[in-house]
């Protein structure tokens, strides 16, 4: 790149910095008015920057509708570029702070509901012991919503069970955990070493709704049952199914992740499922593919990987 071209690029960045930030805010908010409210500026100022950017690019970036706005194809291309620029800037800031001997930063995490308890709490505790100035935002989210949140830059990392492969997502860590039936300690099946789905359906059963990965893992075994079965309750809430099982209302299905305290306090029993063999559920940690990771985020991912390995080892030591 020539000196003249470098000067032109720097000037373009200076001119478009505000427009790109406003564009990203509008994309996230879904409307110019809401973006202006979040930025604490006038709607007209935001609209002016968007129009300027559209004029420079020579194409509309948003389709305007009565209920809000949506990205056009050109807008989606710009959104990918803006996301890379902002995340690279975040990494540069983190690296500079690292050179000063101070790790700071903010990490946004989306995790499936059952993981936002013991597992994530343990990871955040270990992270803050090593980087006291880091801040964390942790949001429970369904497995199907997590890839989009990571790819859109709404969160830095996602933690989910059984995600299908995605070219734009990179799996940076994974733990393999056995699916089991959870029930009250006084349940007739609680003392067994393992149970089949057919045995579980001799009693009231609580089943996950379709959007939960547990349901997808159970589907092949359910299809092989030689009788029609009907759960007494269906729910998309991991916490609700856990609570119902603890109260003796029925049998639910989960991995041991997040059940540590319940099992230790003898409020729940986890009995491994046998469907001609174990049913395994992979808990993966994901970031956007190709992203250069800030030092603080990289550290958080290493801690998550360590925590998952430790839990795999602990589960393997439980008698089958």
Model segments located where?
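Flexible hinge/capping segments at coil-to-helix
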Residues: 166-205
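Beta-alpha-beta core module
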Residues: 166-173, 177, 199, 239-289
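Secondary-structure junction motif
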Residues: 204-225, 293-303, 307-319
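A short LG(V/I)-centered, amphipathic sequence patch enriched
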Residues: 54-76
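Interdomain hinge and pocket-entrance segments immediately C-terminal to HTH DNA-binding domains
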Residues: 16-17, 67, 97-116, 129-134, ...
């Amino acid at each position: 790149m020539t000196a003249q071209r470098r000067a032109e690029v720097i000037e373009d960045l200076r001119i478009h910095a505000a427009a790109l930030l406003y564009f990203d805010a509008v994309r996230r908010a879904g409307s110019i008015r809401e973006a202006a409210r979040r930025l604490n500026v006038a709607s007209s100022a935001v609209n002016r920057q968007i129009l300027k950017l559209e004029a420079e690019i020579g194409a509309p970036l948003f389709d305007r509708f009565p209920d809000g706005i949506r990205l056009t194809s050109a807008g989606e291309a710009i959104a990918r570029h803006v996301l890379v620029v902002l995340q690279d800037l975040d990494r540069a800031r983190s690296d500079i702070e690292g050179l000063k001997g101070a790790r700071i930063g903010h990490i946004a995490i989306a995790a499936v509901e059952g993981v936002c308890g013991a597992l994530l709490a343990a990871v955040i505790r270990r992270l803050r012991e090593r980087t006291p100035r880091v801040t964390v935002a942790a949001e429970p989210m369904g497995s199907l919503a997590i890839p989009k949140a990571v790819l859109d830059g709404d969160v830095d990392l996602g933690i989910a069970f059984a995600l299908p492969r995605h070219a734009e997502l990179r799996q940076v860590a994974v733990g393999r955990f056995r699916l089991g039936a959870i029930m009250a300690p006084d349940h007739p099946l609680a003392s067994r070493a393992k149970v089949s789905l057919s045995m579980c359906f001799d009693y009231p059963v609580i089943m996950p709704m379709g959007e939960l990965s547990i349901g997808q893992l159970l589907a092949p075994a359910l299809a092989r049952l030689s009788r029609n079965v009907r759960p007494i309750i269906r729910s998309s809430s991991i916490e609700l199914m856990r609570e119902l099982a603890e109260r003796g209302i029925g049998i639910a299905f989960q991995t041991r992740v997040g059940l540590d305290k319940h099992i230790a306090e003898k409020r729940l029993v986890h009995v491994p499922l046998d469907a001609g063999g174990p049913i395994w559920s992979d808990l993966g940690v994901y970031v956007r593919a190709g992203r250069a990771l800030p030092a603080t985020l990289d550290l958080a991912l290493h801690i998550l990987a360590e925590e998952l390995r430790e839990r795999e080892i602990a589960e393997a030591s439980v008698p089958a």
